[in-house]
């Protein structure tokens, strides 16, 4: 049987089978991972930072996420491993001289080249557009292509000369296997830092305890002598310290004058002359005393008798 117009329908047009899985466009996925921030989904602009798993972020978005970690604003899966700014590294990127994306005005009749990248590898010159594998160093933040590190094998950064190890190399936007390896390294690194902090705290506590014990322990001058300690009838000990005055030592030596005693005598005489005006004001002074002839032979309530 045919339909109107003489058309004959087929089976696949009438019977609906299972839906096919939606395939994501690879170019669109690369653009989203290499040109946009993982947190805010905005275009990447300097300063650009990368986490220990190789994901790219805007630094402003990371700071906002750390200040307000609400699940409504940012996806927690993308930044759940970021606890502070120490967990991210600011990237030192090399600009592409042939890139003019923001300078030219984009119109509907112009062709937008997605493959052109804003940054390139400073050694080989490959564009950082997702077609080639790129990595950065945790020590300095310089970004290179993986090909450059394989072709020129060194233990020093090609750009700034900072030494690095194999563990410091982190691949940007790697596949699932790369992310698993980087995650394991991140966990080991954080566990190692925690153990180092604990060991430092234990060492500081031990050093403080040693200082306290050294301050409390008596030195050679503070050791008690058995001759100086005399046991009393009540069981208590009294400490008797015998000291010799400096006057006795100086007097025992012939031909030497005691300078301390003369200094004290002079000081007393000086004070007596200075206080002469003040002593005249009191009745105990010699000028205020009456002679015996003027003194009365009886005692009154306020006897002025001296």
Swiss-Prot record:
Biased composition, Basic and acidic residues: where in the chain?
235-250
Superkingdom of this entry's organism? Eukaryota
Q: Which keywords annotate this record? A: Chromosome, Phosphoprotein
Note down the stretches annotated as region Disordered.
193-265
Chief subcellular location = nucleus
The Gene Ontology terms for molecular function here are: DNA binding
- Please state where this protein is localized: Chromosome
| The UniProt record lists the keyword Ribosomal protein | no
Summarize the protein's role.
Replication termination factor which is a component of the elongating replisome. Interacts with nascent DNA.
UniProt-recorded name of the protein:
Replication termination factor 2
Q: Which organism is it from?
A: Gallus gallus (Chicken)
Q: Which gene encodes it?
A: RTF2
